[in-house]
Amino acid sequence: MGQLQKAKINQTQKAIVEIKNRFQKYFAKNLNLSRVTAPLFVEGQSGLNDHLDHKQKAVSFYAKKLNKTLEIVQSLAKWKRLALLDYGFSLYEGLYTDMNAIRADDDIDEIHSIYVDQWDWEILINKQDCTLDFLKSIVNKIYSTIKTVQLEIDQLYNPKQIILPDSITFIGSQELEDLYPHLTPSQREYEFAKMHQAIFIYQIGYPLKSGYIQSIRSPEYDNWNLNGDLIVYHKLNDQAIELSSMGIRVSKQDFIKQTNFANLKNDQENNFYHQMILNDQLPQTIGGGIGQSRLCMFLLNKKHIGEVQVSVWPNEYKDELLKKGIKLL
């Protein structure tokens, strides 16, 4: 490795630390969050793992001394809601944690890796807060945090390299389809993100008028009428990048409606988490995840997520990127 490349990588590593430290500090303050320790794995039969679109299989292993099969978490969407109850948080207090996951079935490209690192967060709220206005208020706080860190990182490393608007643009998934009826959901995201630079698409899960779904969502945690994705336009790659997904969590009624719609009722009787929802034992919350590596990639204006995180990539893939001057960590 040449000295110039080594210096570049060292600067990137320092910048990653700066981004993560600054973001966590402002994020916790703006949303009234306390940092907690989170599990790397959970019991396979507990129902606490996130099964995403119910097609991606969790990585599992057998723990001999426990005589149990454990699963590497795919996200902490369910665990966090239970943790707020167990840890005795008060109204409008919340938690955040470092979530490290392995998603063996994920795609591999410039923004996808089988290793996932994100800040998972959850806040205790009132049932009266289950509105789009409240969801948008939380989105604005998160976006404000991202914008603050962007300005500070630009001053330290790349002045005016990444420009984010002062405010984020909101749009419903159906409104987005009406705007671009001839495009696919991902194409709509790209066009709208390119136009506005930072967007939040809300109400994701149910079919649109066309019969298509904006993006497949698990029916078990977000209320599909009160959720959404925070997306930015990455000019270097000419690409829309989802930095965060979040939502107000399901009530008993939401859960029944959504699982019936998704035809995922079969395991409810034996699922600890499902039973807690059906028995109204979980608090009303809002929560989500923010991709750490994606945020770093975007703010540092990198072409590939592998420039800011260590994962495993095919050798021929790494060689091709190296020819383009992209060195993966």
Swiss-Prot record:
Coiled coil listed as a keyword: no
Cellular localisation: Cytoplasm
Pathways involved: Amino-acid biosynthesis; L-asparagine biosynthesis; L-asparagine from L-aspartate (ammonia route): step 1/1
Alphabetized InterPro entries for the sequence: aa-tRNA-synth_II, aa-tRNA-synth_II/BPL/LPL, AsnA
Coiled coil: none
PROSITE patterns in the cross-refs: AA_TRNA_LIGASE_II
UniProt-listed Enzyme Commission number(s): 6.3.1.1
Keywords carried by this UniProt record: Amino-acid biosynthesis, Asparagine biosynthesis, ATP-binding, Cytoplasm, Ligase, Nucleotide-binding
Single GO term (MF): ATP binding
Entry's Gene Ontology BP terms: L-asparagine biosynthetic process
PANTHER family associated with the record: ASPARTATE--AMMONIA LIGASE
Official protein name in the record: Aspartate--ammonia ligase
Lineage: Bacteria, Bacillati, Mycoplasmatota, Mycoplasmoidales, Mycoplasmoidaceae
Encoding gene, per UniProt annotation: asnA
